[in-house]
Amino acid sequence: MAILLFCTAACSDSYLELSPESSVSDEVIFENADAAQYAVNGLGRIMSTQYLDTQGYNGEGTVYAYQGEYPGDVIQKGSYTGWQNLAKGNYFTSSTNSNIHVTWYYYYKLIRNANQILDNCKTGLANVAEQRKWDYIKAQALVYRAYSYTMLSQLYSRRWTDADGLQRGLVLRTTVNNDEMPCSTMAETFELIYHDLDEAISLFTSCGYDRPVDVDKRWMANLDVAHAVYSRAALIRNDWQTVITHSQEARRNYSIMTPDEYKAGFNTANQEWIWEVFEDDTQPVHYYSFYNYMSASCLGSASRTYPPCISKQIVDPIDPADKRLAIYAIPTPEEVGDVSKVSGSGKVTKGDFYNRVKKEFAGRIYSTTTIFYYLSTKFIVKSGTGDGCIPIFRAAEMMYNEAEAQYRLGNEQAVRALLEQTVKPYNADYTCTKSGDSLWEELKAYRKFDLCNEGHSWFDLKRWGDPMVRKTWAEGGSWATYFAEKNTTTGGNYGPADK
């Protein structure tokens, strides 16, 4: 993948490298559409690279782990007591903590690079074929910008329902400049997101270009990705009919992965992945990588010593016949025994469970990985240093998004049908007959379980306004006491927006 990276800016001069020695002039980069496509490819590389000289800061994967999962209610990081503030989201109330600063930096880097491409896109060319190429380039850049503002909004702004879009939004940069700007409203933020996506969809449709059909090119943005971004953005905005429309369009060319594909390690795109973060051994970020923090098979200590573990509260509502459960080391009651004797978050060093996991999961964990109850082996590295692609959008998410929108509109039969479509590939006997609040809880339970580790947990809690409840072993859960939470405050009232 050819790469050209530009300098970046958000709200202050600290984000802008004014005269980098390796800079290439706009005249060279944007000499023609073929050259400009390399710059668009560079946007994909920005999503997986080292940031701020800090391990764990890798771009998109950092957002999924540090904001999406660790502060949520689905995954705990083994017995890593030093991460209590991260796991409890305490850094959300700090204006100086790098864990919240890095996400702002990363997405505005994407936005600035997208803006530099958009500022230089050609229009009105007499050469129709060349103009179509430029339209394709512009459409891709618009998708990256819209996606970046969507992700920034769900982290740094309050929920849409808190003030119907009148609350503080973001700094909306649509050109390459570093001038001071006020924050927009949330409504203005989503007006720009929708505008960018509408234009991108129109350009993708009219230009006649698409990314290659090879699954290893799923890191490239296309029409389907534009619809997927629209689906997620509309979900945040509570724009239910728009969610339904774009969820259906986004997944039109994709199908739910098979049980074998689901258990294959989530490190390579397949028939279900709509968009991905690309990474392999030719472009590794080593110990900075997502897999070094969300896998149990990487040789890094953050993976081996403190592997991710799914919460018992997430597993318990799922039918035991579901084949997806096989990627988690779920103990039997006999293997656990007296819960009062369980150490911390469930570390095990000997006995039947330990021996079973070492044998059954031998190909899914590193040889010296510490064993825990409910150990997650969803993400398996391609190589020991942490290489592997990451799904940004899957067809399943689009179906859960649509189901949530259908529920909000009172279309319960549609919700039941969508749930059955997502679950039956893994449990042929699954039938959903629930209604009302029970149906809502069923939908949330399967969304949490299916999208586990993929960066959705905290964002979902915030959107739903759900309390954070992490039960200890004594309370029927599997959380260590130092990670446990009984926060009855709704998700819309905690997070960076409060600061």
Task: Identify the role of each PLM range.
Residues 12-13, 204, 223-261:
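Aromatic-residue-lined binding/catalytic grooves and analogous aromatic/hydrophobic interfacial grooves
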Residues 111-114, 190, 197, 247, ...:
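Inward-facing hydrophobic residues that define packing positions of alpha-helical scaffold repeats
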